[in-house]
Amino acid sequence: MKTNLKNAGIISLLAISLAVSGCSTGKQDDKEAVASMGASTVQSQQSSESQSITASQNSSGNPQNSVSKEDKTDSVVIDNFGVTTTYDKAPERVVPLSYDAAQILVALGLEDKIVGIATAEGSYKDCLPEYQEKLSKLKVIVEGTPTFEVLLSEKPDFVYATVYTFGKYGVAPVEDFQKEKINFYCINGTFSKEAKFSDIYKDIEDLGKIFRKEAEATKLIDSLKSREEALRANVKQTDVKVMAFDSGDKAVLTSGKGIEDEMIKLAGGNNIFEDLDNAFEEVSFEEAAKRNPDIIIIHSYDVGDTNGTTEEKIESLKKNPALENVTAIKNDNFVVVKLVEVFPGLQIFDAAERLNKKITELAK
């Protein structure tokens, strides 16, 4: 089935775990949603309205640090997304709102606590092979993103999701989760002003504390850090120019400041739109041509509205007259990545390694 690349891509980016599929009201609303989800805006709003909530029976301690563990009560205090939450015990009914979020929980050995999952625009097949079997057995509560009512029907005591979940076009605002006494953890790299790989490590560290899986979290963080360090040690920075292409037939939905920009730098490339303030923004094809990327990253989706459009996306770029003189187009220099590989999660270095291979070929 032929899809509208622009609309499907915008919806997908707002949906994945990411978490807004099916909640927008139209193409223009989707554009506004992308723009309104700038990290600095969300961070500012949450910081100014910081609230304190507790899980289970709250301790009376007054935490001095963003994360602490009190020896007497075994309570864990977490600061996340402008909200301070005390966990007297590990959550028991967990709902991640994407497979990449679920994958981190499974990597920590928490699959038995997951009572349901929303697929967003992903599939368990997008995830790492070692986790696919366990992920495939999770109960799917909705294809896409749930309404708040559907989420409530699972009686969760913990939700793990991106910033989009709590926005205008997401599941529900933070206050609604608090009213229902549902604790949550918002993926740091989706609302940080300038996302870094350290945001991924912070997520895992905090989840390890919340679920009393510190040893597993440390092991997972160490394995990711070793890959990051190997790339930094072996990758040579180049002048190769890179552009990410998610979708678009009237304009390019591309990556600005965000974790994908960090990934491109780590791989030795230069994001031609690193000057954009938001993680995802639309730019004209003419501006893309002017900046003339040597490589174009294609975001691939396995399921959802954009199913099967990887080749279609590439073909649309090749046929676009505005791009006919672009180096990447003329030389067929495309690198395909799964969307989950360019969001803050376990697979970000897979994308970096794949991109670096192409950059190295061009830099010879």
What is each stretch, according to the model?
Residues 2-10, 14, 23-103, 209-244, ...:
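Bacterial Sec-exported substrate-binding components of ABC uptake systems
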Residues 121-125, 253-281:
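Alpha-helical, coiled-coil/dimerization segments enriched in small aliphatic residues
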Residues 79-82, 138-149, 277-285:
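Short helix-initiation/N-cap motifs at beta->coil->alpha
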Residues 123-125, 163-172, 182-206, 243-261:
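Extracytoplasmic ligand-binding site segments that recognize negatively charged/polar headgroups
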Residues 95-154, 158, 163-164:
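A short, structured surface patch at a secondary-structure boundary
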Residues 195-212, 216-218, 297-364:
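Structured C-terminal subdomain patch of bacterial secreted/periplasmic proteins
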Residues 163-166, 189, 276, 299-303:
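Short secondary-structure boundary segments
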